[in-house]
Curated annotation (Swiss-Prot):
Homology family: Belongs to the phosphoglycerate mutase family. GpmB subfamily.
Keyword Secreted belongs to the record: no
Organism: Photorhabdus laumondii subsp. laumondii (strain DSM 15139 / CIP 105565 / TT01) (Photorhabdus luminescens subsp. laumondii)
Pathway, per record: Carbohydrate degradation; glycolysis; pyruvate from D-glyceraldehyde 3-phosphate: step 3/5
EC number: 5.4.2.-
Catalytic residues identified in the record: H9, E82
Gene for this chain: gpmB
One Pfam family it belongs to: His_Phos_1
Top-level EC class as recorded in UniProt: isomerase
Protein name (database record): Probable phosphoglycerate mutase GpmB
Site (Transition state stabilizer) residue list: H150
Listed SMART domains: PGAM
Reaction catalysis annotation: (2R)-2-phosphoglycerate = (2R)-3-phosphoglycerate
């Protein structure tokens, strides 16, 4: 059985400022750095062999903190990037016009053909995220990889493993530095292939999430 751990990056400056990041970038906040240290301690005893990360700065920094604790090298994987949000990237979510908000909702709610201008569809995201996960099956036998990616991207991956449409990720809350695990296995009691063992675990974190503070 192959066990693959999934970590969302730590809180970034644009997370805190409510700016749309997508494949644009901003550094981790002090809280984000702290979250990364906490999840690193959480997985320290899990015998992680590979840390594979999106090549964006916020995920790379999170991966660096985890790698230092786990003693692993970092592998960059562009297919783990966040959903490309096109012309809305870098914008504050509260500044969107009604038309722009319709674009954003269409891409996230599964509207056929939903796509922000110059951006990516949820189905395209699902294809590349699954390809990145499947590549883990080429690692040496006994490997226990950890993937560092993004909220929408990881939600899409976990949801599609469960047989849900790509846009169902909006029903799954994966907070900054939450920990999930998916396994590739063959069991007489479960579906063969990828299954979800756990999703969105935050028991290792010690501060409220942004969405809790902003209620």
């Amino acid at each position: 059985m192959l066990q693959v751990y999934l970590v969302r990056h730590g809180e970034s400056e644009w997370n805190a400022a409510r700016r749309i990041q997508g494949q644009s970038d901003s550094p981790l906040t002090e809280t984000g750095e702290h979250q990364a240290r906490l999840v690193a301690q959480r997985v320290k005893s899990e015998s992680i062999t590979h840390i594979i990360t999106s090549d964006l700065g916020r995920t790379r920094r999170t991966a660096e903190i985890i790698a230092k604790v786990c003693g692993c090298e970092i592998i960059l994987e562009p297919r783990l990037r966040e959903l490309h949000m096109g012309v809305l990237e870098r914008r504050n979510i509260d500044s969107l016009t009604s038309e722009e908000e319709k674009w954003r909702k269409k891409v996230l709610d599964g509207t056929p053909g939903g796509r922000i201008p110059k951006g990516e569809s949820m189905d395209e995201l699902a294809v590349r995220m699954r390809a990145a996960l499947e590549n883990c099956r080429n690692l040496p036998v006994g490997s226990r990889p950890l993937l560092v990616s993004h909220g929408i991207a990881l939600g899409c991956l976990v949801g599609t493993i469960l047989g849900l449409p790509a846009h169902a990720e909006r029903r799954l809350r994966l907070r900054n530095c939450s920990l999930s695990r998916v396994d590739y296995q063959h069991s007489p009691w479960l579906a063969s292939g990828w299954i979800v063992e756990t999703a969105g675990d935050i028991t290792h974190l010690d501060t409220p999430a942004l969405d809790e503070l902003q209620r």
